[in-house]
Amino acid sequence: MEEEVTDDEYRAALEALQSTISGKTRAAPKGPHDLTWEQQFDRLHVYLDRLGMTESVNAMSYIHVAGTKGKGSTCAFVDTVLRRSGTRTGLYTSPHLVDIRERYRVDGAPVSKTTFTRNFWWLHHKLKETCEADLGMPAYFRFLTLLGFRIFTSMNVDAVVLEVGLGGRLDATNVIRSPAVCGVTSLGLDHVEVLGDTVGKIAREKAGIFKPNCPAITSPQVPEAMESLELRASEVSGCELTVARPLRDWRTVGGVPLVLGLAGKHQELNAALAIELMRVWCGRVSPASCPWGASALSDLATGTLPEKWVVGLAETEWFGRAQVVPDDVEDLSWFLDGAHTEESMRHVAEWFCGHDGLGQSQSQSQNQITEPVRLLLFNCMEERDPEMLLTPLAQTAEAMNAPITAPALFTPSESSSKGLVPFAGVQDVTWQGKVARTWDELARRHAGCVRASEQQVVGEVPTGVPTGVPTGVPTSSLSLSSLAASAVVPCLRQAVESVRRRAREERALGSGRRVHVLVTGSLYLVGDMLRVLGRAG
C-alpha cells in the first residue's frame, strides 16, 4: 500500500503549482517571443507526446461539455447517474471552491491528497525533464488539465465527464481527439473580451469542441447561437447536432415523480441535456465499459427513464450552486450560488425569492408562513458589469414581492484566480464601493426591491458608516439593524458575524422570522463562504 503524503508534502505541491499561475489572458502577443493562444493550445499535443500520454489519454471515453451556463450542473447530473448505474467515473470541473482536489473526482469523491500529490510531482518532474528547455512549462489551467488526464488514466475510470474551462475551441480540454459525445449548455454573453461580443461568436467558440464522427447535443438556444452551432456542425464530418428532448417528455417507471437534486426551474434544461448525453454515450461505448447500457437504451427507446437514472437525478448535488446551508445560529440560512451572468442571476433571484420563512419553496409550503428577512451578501469580479448582474435581482425581488432587507452587504472575496491560498490581509474595497452604489441606484429605480429594516431608526446612521462607500467598521460596531441602504464590509468573516447578530436580534424580538441570506455574484465568494462556515468539501 502506498504511503500517504504529509500535509507539508501536499502544501509543497500547491506552492509549486502556484508558480504556473501567470495571470495572462487570451490577448494578442505583446512581444516577439510571446505565443498566440492558438500556438499555446497546439503545444498541448506536444506535451502529451513527450509525456508518453497521447495513446492512454485518447483511449479513454469522454463526455465533453461546453457552454455559458449550467456546465457544472450538467456534468454533475451525468456523473451522479452514471455512478448510480454502476460506472466508474472521473469528473473534471473548474474552478474549485475550497480545495484544488475538487476539480478531480473519482466515483464522486475528490481524489486524496496522496493521489493528487504523487501524480502532481510525476507530471511536474516529467515536464521539467522533457519540455522545459524548449517549450517551457504549461500555464496553470493547461497544467491542471494534463494532471487530470494523468490521474484518470492511472485510476482506470470507465468514463471521463469533462467540463470545458473557458470557451471550447482553444480550451485545454479540447486536446482530446475522439469524445463519445459532446454537449453544449445554454449560451449567453460571458468572457466577451476573450470569446467575442455577440452570442453568435461565443457559440462558434463553444462549438469548437465538435469532432468528426461524434454526435453533439445542445440545450435549446436563441436563434443566433443555434445558427452558429449548426454551421459549425455542418463543417465537421459526421457531426450530427440535435437539441435535447425536454425533460417533461420523459416518463418514469410507475409514474413516480421526477425530482431533481439541484434546485431551480433552469435545472430542467441541464438535466434534459445530461439525459441525452448519457443516452448517446451508452450507445457508443463497449459493453465492458457499460454493461447496463443495453437495458437502459431499451427503456429510453420507449420514452422511459431507467429507475437508476431517476434516482441519480434526484441524488445529484453540486456545491455552491443553489445550495442552502443552515447556520449554527438558529433561524439563519445561507443561500449560496456562484451565479455570475445575467441569466444565471435571474434564475438565482427566482430561486431565492421563492423560498418562504421555513426555507422551503413556496410551492412546497402548505400553510401561511411568516415572511423571512431576506439579506444580500454580494461580490463580483472587476471584469463583470455589476449593473447587469444586480438588475435581475432587483427586478425579481420587486416582481415577486420579496424585497431584500437593507442593508445589502458588499465584501471582497478572499480567493481569486491569481492564487491557491486565500488572501488574509486587508484588501482594497474601492470596487465593492462602486458595486454598492450600483445597488443603491437600482433600489431607487425599483422601489419594491428593498425594504428598510423594521428595527431601523430613520436617519440614524452610525458615524463613519456612509452607505455605499468603502468602510472599515469594526465588527463590534456594525449593526445591520441600524444601517440605511448598502454597506461595504472589508472582511467576509466580519460580514458573517454582522448577519449572525441580525439573526439573534430577530430571535430576541420573538418575531418568528427566519433570516435568509443570498450569497452570490462569484464562485470565489461562495467558496470562501463555505470555508468560513466550515462546510468545505
Task: Say what each PLM segment does.
Residues M1-G67, S73-T87, L91-Y92, E132-L135:
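Short functional linear segments
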Residues A28-W37, D49-R50, T54-M60, R84-R177, ...:
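ATP-dependent carboxylate-amine ligase catalytic core
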Residues L147-T153, I275-G283, R531:
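Short glycine/serine- and small hydrophobic-enriched flexible loop segments
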Residues A159-V160, A172-G183, L187-G188, K201, ...:
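Nucleotide phosphate-binding/pyrophosphate-handling subdomain across enzymes
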Residues L166-V236, L375, E387-M388:
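Conserved catalytic-core segment of NTP-binding enzymes
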Residues S219-A225, W318, A339-G464, G468, ...:
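Active-site beta-alpha connecting loops in nucleotide-dependent enzymes
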Residues T242, A436-T438, A484-S498:
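Short acidic-hydrophobic, aromatic-tinged amphipathic segments that line or gate anion-handling sites
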Residues S522:
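Active-site-proximal loop/hinge segments that shape catalytic or ion-binding/gating pockets
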